[in-house]
Amino acid sequence: MARLVFGMNQSLDGYVDHTANAPRPALFRRLIEEARAQVGSVYDRHTYEVMRYWDDDQPEWDAEERAFAAAWRNQPKWVVSRSLKSVGPNARLVEDDLEAAIRLLKAERDGEIEVAGPNLAHSLTALGLIDEYRIYLHPVVLGHGKPYFAGPRPPLRLVSHDRIGQDVIRLTYVPA
């Protein structure tokens, strides 16, 4: 059975913003490794649209950006949306009955499936479907934005922590 994992970069004051917390090289290398190891990703519409950036090679990309793009393209993707009519390569729409679709996905796969997007993670948390939370804590204060937890914080238990590079700490939690 697959494990659903929600991980995002977070500021010290609890907000997620990919433009303000872009990963530094050590973290980016870790994210490439994770993307290669994952058996898929589940996206909300907005996050999927942002991630479509990786669909087409850019001439200015370095080797690590090309490696991440290749890992991302190879992953099966499930996009939760009622407004999208189509999705890109290696992606499928999830339009109805989120709980049933994710339970089936977890039952059919083995390995780790990433959850992308705080609103989607909130919905999946409320359904009791997320198995692990990874907070990549950055030493910045944003003061506003989208919170990592887009609703009440679930009861969690810290299971590990590690430092990535000089300034990022990964906190790994499971439901308590």
PLM feature spans:
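Enzymes that bind and transform nitrogen-containing heteroaromatic metabolites
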Residues: 1-176
